[in-house]
From Swiss-Prot:
Keyword RNA-binding: yes
Annotated protein name in UniProt: Small ribosomal subunit protein uS8
Subunit structure: Part of the 30S ribosomal subunit. Contacts proteins S5 and S12.
Gene3D superfamilies recorded: 3.30.1370.30, 3.30.1490.10
One annotated GO biological process: translation
GO MF entries: rRNA binding; structural constituent of ribosome
């Protein structure tokens, strides 16, 4: 079966595993997914990531983070979809929950957070919001 939106699949797997409080979640690997996972680690939403090969399919294992019984990730939302791409200019970069969350943006310099995009003065495609 052909997957039309692998990034949405990754976010949904993380969201579902987080809701039922799984310690780890595994997703098929790609360069974009690795970049998103690295941002989640860098921003403190995920403990760490591990790359491995499950047969011929490279995978990413994300260790989810919890604060006691509370989830660190309270929400994940895919913004730009294959059927409706959402772009922002450097002056219109969105803030998630007035800066408490993170917008992940694909720019010409790679995949960065909203704060990094503002600092670099870059716009791009808004991939998702995490809070």
């Amino acid at each position: 079966m052909v997957m039309t939106d692998p990034i949405a699949d990754m976010l949904t797997r993380i969201r579902n595993a987080n809701i039922v409080r799984h310690e780890v979640v595994e997703v098929p690997s790609s360069n974009v997914k690795k970049s998103i996972a690295n941002i989640l680690v860098q921003e403190g939403y995920v403990k760490d990531i591990e790359e491995y090969a499950d047969g011929a399919v490279p995978m990413i294992r994300l260790s989810l983070k919890y604060n006691g019984k509370e989830r660190i990730i309270t929400g994940l939302k895919r913004i730009s979809k294959p059927g409706l791409r959402v772009y922002c200019k450097k002056d219109n970069i969105p803030k998630v929950l007035n800066g408490l969350g993170v917008a992940i943006i694909s720019t010409s310099k790679g995949i960065v957070t909203d704060r990094e995009a503002r600092k670099l003065g870059l716009g791009g495609e808004v991939i998702c919001y995490v809070w």
